[in-house]
Each structure stands twice: as structure tokens, then as C-alpha cells.
Amino acid sequence: MSLPSASNHAHAASPVYSNSNNNKSSASSKKTSSKNDLLRCAVGLLLKQKNYVSNERFRRSDFLLLQNKQQFAVNKMLDTDLHGGNSFTFSNVQVITNNQHTVDQQFGRFSQFVEAQAEPLRLEMKRFYGPMLCHFYLDLLKAREPRGAVELLRKYAHLVAPVDMYDAPPPTKINGCSTTANESTFNIRFAKEAQDTGDTELDYFMRLVQTLSGYTRLEAAESDDTVAHFRSSKYELHTTAVVVNRICAYLQRRGHVLIMNLLYTWLHVHIVENEQRAFSEDHLLGLTDDLEGEDGEDDVVSKPAVTLNTRGDIRPSKSLTEKSNRKRPAEEPNIMLETDIKQEVETDESAELSKLQLNIDACLDTLKSATEQILKSQVELPRFLRISERSRGLTSAHLDPSECHMLAGFDNSAVQLWQLNQSYCRGKSFYRRYPQKRCPWELNNCANQEEETDEDSSDEDVKCSEEERRERNRARHCKYADNSYNEYGGFQLRGHTKGVTDVRFSAHYPLMYSVSKDATMRCWRAHNLHCAAIYRSHNYPIWCLDESPVGQYVVTGSKDLSARLWSLEKEHALIIYAGHTQDVECVAFHPNGNYIATGSADHSVRLWCATSGKLMRVFADCRQAVTQLAFSPDGKMLAAAGEETKVRIFDLAAGAQLAELKDHSASISSLSWSTHNRHLATACSDGTLRLWDIKKLSPMSDNSSAGSSSSATTNRVLTVNSSCQRLVDVFYGTSKTLYCIGT
């Protein structure tokens, strides 16, 4: 037996030798792989360990290691301009979470530092308010602190521009039952004077603050295009080196970390000596097409600049291109042709004419604005109407919507109607004020009626005494001087069995209403002056009434401690509003018709839902009986007055007292708001009238007594001592004329 040959079969079936051969082949294949693959794998493993990538598979396009010079320059520029997503920075959100008072404290101290500077520096530093306030607001929303964000914006919005406190729209639901405090929105509106400055940067941040005030959730705010653009990159701010040095020294001394991080993260401060950039709306919104040049000199030449003078006015400065164009080159000859001289003269004349036209237009605009301001500040004097009562006891009065007739109620159960002209009326024969006047309360004169009334009056003259007959004749032949109306003019309506407490013309129908101490309400028609309906539901005297702004409904207040809602089609009350502990002295409908306010002798004002009778608000700030109520035309405020010598104004949305109007000499007998929601007229029982400017109101502070007394003279526009012993009603007509009725 022969053994196998070593030379032929030495390593044929040996598994060891076969593995060694495979390893050698794999090693040769690994040597062929490039260095980029090795680096890519190493970088991928490092990024995976640091959790910088989310995918497990690495592609070649994910880790591109080779770039040309142009791509490297572009990426470098993007890295410097954009905020790096993987870079770790100090986060304001982590600090202000559950600690929103830190933002208020640091921003408040920064504002005190700015306001303490000199005038030029203060005007320049105030430009930091807008971006800082907006970014702090968004950071607080991101930290889930909406209440702190709302308080911060509401507290410091006036630093950006003057805020108009009462131009903000009301919340969607006045009762506030279905929305919580965190979900309720507020809106900031800046004053009209601040919107006419012509400063593009200021207008941009005013619009941004107004937009942010409507959002209390970060997701909703970031969905807005303006907010998203503002938050997408750093805001470029041009200022002087003095301002930057002052702010840096202050931050180093105080150590306000939140402000320093905000300036580092969201602001790009560019120092320009004695110059700053002229911001336009396109620059602020990033809509310009101009690109920065590669050379530094071209960049300086292409940028327009403006000069900041000591008063803070921004004036455009001459660019380097304009200066270079005005320089005469050395190669240009000094000899000019006659045609060139004529062309230069013509261009100079046209430039002067254009400047003159611009000056004329500016003067006309200034004159127009000044005229508008004068007319706006001018106050029209009121018109006084005096009723001679002769111990009849005048209790109430009112004017019709056409302002041509007057209605009065007396304590002797009489209701009397006059027309507002200087001629007297006898019986039902009303003299027409104008031939083509259309008024439902005005009747045509008839000869037969005049003869009948003459005969009736002659019979009455025979029955009356000589003194009464002399008084009648004097009243008939008199022209009612000084707008005085007595019992012999007009037409008397009889029906109540006790004294009349309140009367009212209907604003929607040719009707009028009257309530009396006999616990009834009567409705009178215009075409025949007869009683159309009698409404009975109260058990005690009725003191007041008011008609719904949408018609069909009337509300009354009574001595039975309740207010009741009536429909003109039913003789019994629909809803009873019970809750007061004493007489309901006054009632008022909200301008939208959905709410009713009641004032009582129990020193409280209550707000009710008109349809359900549910109690919405209780204002218990009054110290004496409330006898007068008046809603503002926009429905945001409620004025209450009575036996106190002050008027209290309540904010319906907040459910708290907003301000007080003092300086009254007696109890207030009537209130009335102007149609444009600017003035409030108050009439006193001693015959004095006061007009208040509501736009100048300031919110009540902790020491409200001192603040209210000091602001009383500034808010008061007009004080008039009428010839009446007492005023019973003030009324703004459709012609915006203020009528005052007294006796």
C-alpha cells in the first residue's frame, strides 16, 4: 500500500489552509477600500453615539466629506447667519419654566436703566424694547407660561408705543363662564397718535406686538407668517458704540443672564458710528433683492445710511456714491458748452420747483392734521330745556329719536308731551315745526279742532279764578323763552292713578312707555295718543324702565326687590330677575341686548343674562344707593352713580372697578355716553352738568383716593351751572347734541 504523495495532496483537504487563504483574500479586498469610507464609518459611529442622527443606516449622501471652495464658502456663510441646530447654548426656556417672574424682574430693571439715560441715548436704547419684548413673550409661551406672557406684554407694551386702553375688542363671552383665564385672549391696540410717526421700524414692532397679543399658545403664534419670519433668524439692529458700551457695562454689573442670552441668540447688533440703517418695510420683511457684494468697499457704498441727530430725528445721509458723483474727475475739462450750461440751469430750476411742491404738500398736510385735531378736541355746548312744574313734582323726562318732542312724567300721575319749538301748543292742535316734517308724534292743525279747543278753553277760563286765568293768558301769549315748557302747553296723558316715576320714547316703534307707583306700566300710541296696553305683574311701585336695543322687550325695576322682562305682546312678565335685598332703582340693557344691569338701594350692581335670568356679575364697590346706570356704546364699560358724589366705571370683562369720577357737588341724577364712546355726561341734582373725557382715564391703583382726586381735573372737559334748580335727564341725540332737561 502506497501512501499519498505530499507534493500533490499536501494541502488539498486541509481546512486550516483553506481559512488562511480566505483571510488573505479578504485582507486584499479591504486594502482596496478608500479612506473616505473609513472616515465616514468613524464619523457615523461618533454621531450615533452622540445621538446626532436618527437613522441607523448611513448613506454616502448623508456624510459628504469633499467640497469645493464655492460650496465651502456658501456653507460657511449659512452657518454664521443661521442658528445651529446641534450646537448647545444656554436656554432661556429652561430657566423661566415655573419662574416667569425672573423675566419681569430683569426686563423691568432694564427699562428703568434705559429711562434714566440722557435723551439721545434713551431714544436709541428704546429700539431694543420691541425685539426683546416679543422674544420674551414667545419664550414664555414656549415654557408653557401663558399667564406670565400675557402679564409681561400687558405691563410693558407701553414702552414700545403709547397703548390705547379702551380700543381693544371685548372677549367673545362677557360672562366668562365657558372660557378659563388661561385660554382667554387679550388684544393690545396702540394709540392713533403713535401710528402716524412714519417710523417703519416702530410700525413693524407695533403690528408684531398687536399680532402676538392675540395668541396665548405657541403653536397658534408660530402659524402666523409675521411671527414665523420674525422668529426664523436674528434681527439686525444698527446702533452706535456708545449705546453698546453702556448696555454691556450694565449687563456685566447686573448679571441679567436672560437678557444677555436673548441678545446673543436673537439679535445681531451692528455698530455704526453716528449712523444707523434706514429701515424700510421690505428690509424688515426680507423682501429686498439686493445682495451683499463680495468686496467690503462695495458693501459700504451700496448700503444707504441715515444720520441720528440729538433730537432723535432720523435724516438720510449722503451715500458715498452720491459724494463721488459730485466730485469732478481730473480728466474732465473745465470749459463747458452753452448747451450744457442751459441744461444745468434747467435741471436746477426743476429741482427747486419739485422741492417747493414738496414743501407746499407738507404744509397742506400739516394744516389738515392740525384742523382735524382742533375739531376733534372742540366740545359742543349742551342745550338746556327747562320745564315749569309748579309743584307738580317733575320725576322724569325724555326726548324722542327725532329730537322734536319731549315727554315728562309728574308726581301728580300726569304725563305731558311737548314739541321742541318756540311756539306754544293748545290741546291736541300741535303746530308743525317744518311743513314737510315727518314725525309720528306730530299732529296736523285743524280749524275745527282749534275752534273746539278755543271754546273749551273759554269755558275753563270762566270756571277758573282770576289769578289762574291771568296765568293761562300769560302762558298762551308767551313764546316759551329760555326753552321753558309749562303745564299749559303740550298735551297731557291721563291714565295712571298714582305718581309717574319714569317715561321713555320707543326707539323702534311709534310708542312711548310710562311706569308709575300704581305698579303698572302703560304703552301709548302715537297716532291717537291713547293707552294701547297696561302691563301688570309687579306688586309694588315701579321705579324705572328701559327698552331693549333690538326692540320687542322692556325691562322694569320695582320696589318688590326684583326686575322683570316684558314683551309688548303679553301683559304679564316673561322673566323675573330676583337677587337684590332692597329696591331696584335703575335698569339698563346692554348694547347687544343679551344682558341687563340692575342697580339697587342695597349698594350693589348686578349683571344678568336677559334670556335665561342667570346672574353673571356682581359689583359691590358702591357705598350708597345706585340710582343711575349707563353702558358705553361699545359695551365694554358700565357707569354707575347715585346718591354718592362720584361715578364708578366698571370693566365688564374683568368684573372689577376701572376708575372713579369724583368732584361732583351733589348726587348724580342722570348719565349719558356720547355716540363715539369718548365723553360721559353727568347731571347732578343741584343743576350742574359735567363732561368727562373717558380716553384720559387711568386704571385704579391701590391708593385710589389720591389717584382719583388728582385725575378728576384732567379728565373733566366741561363744567356748566345751568339755570335749572335740578336736572332730571341728560340725553345724546342722533345729531350728537347733548340735551339737558331740568326744572
Curated annotation (Swiss-Prot):
Lipid biosynthesis listed as a keyword: no
CDD domains recorded: WD40
Pfam families the record matches: Beta-prop_EML_2 (PF23414), WD40 (PF00400)
GO cellular component, as recorded: nucleus; SAGA complex
Phenotype when the gene is knocked out: Larval lethal in 2nd instar stage. RNAi-mediated knockdown in female germ line cells results in arrested oogenesis at stage 6-7.
Record key words, sorted: Chromosome, Nucleus, Repeat, Transcription, Transcription regulation, WD repeat
Record-linked SMART domains: WD40
Entry-linked PROSITE patterns: WD_REPEATS_1, WD_REPEATS_2, WD_REPEATS_REGION
Subcellular location: Nucleus; Chromosome
UniProt GO BP: positive regulation of transcription by RNA polymerase II
Signal sequence residues: none
Per-repeat ranges for WD: 389-428, 493-524, 535-576, 577-618, 619-660, 661-702
InterPro entries for the chain: Beta-prop_EML-like_2nd, G-protein_beta_WD-40_rep, TFIID_NTD2_sf, WD40/YVTN_repeat-like_dom_sf, WD40_repeat_CS, WD40_repeat_dom_sf, WD40_rpt
Family membership noted in the UniProt record: Belongs to the WD repeat TAF5 family.
Role description: Component of the transcription regulatory complex SAGA, a multiprotein complex that activates transcription by remodeling chromatin and mediating histone acetylation and deubiquitination. The SAGA complex predominantly acetylates histone H3. Involved in acetylation of histone H3 on 'Lys-10' (H3K9ac) by the SAGA complex in the larval central nervous system. Involved in SAGA complex coactivator functions. Required for oogenesis.
Domain notes: The C-terminus containing the 6 WD repeats is required for association with other components of the SAGA complex.
Subunit details: Component of the Spt-Ada-Gcn5 acetyltransferase (SAGA) complex consisting of wda/Taf5L, Saf6, Taf9, Taf10b, Taf12, Ada1, Spt3, Spt7, Spt20, Sf3b3, Sf3b5, Nipped-A/Tra1, a histone acetyltransferase (HAT) module made up of Gcn5, Ada2b (Isoform B), Ada3 and Sgf29, and a deubiquitinase (DUB) module made up of not/nonstop, Sgf11 and e(y)2 tethered to SAGA by Atxn7. Not essential for the assembly or integrity of the SAGA complex. Not a component of the Ada2a-containing ATAC complex.
Name of the protein in its database record: Protein will decrease acetylation
Originating species: Drosophila melanogaster (Fruit fly)
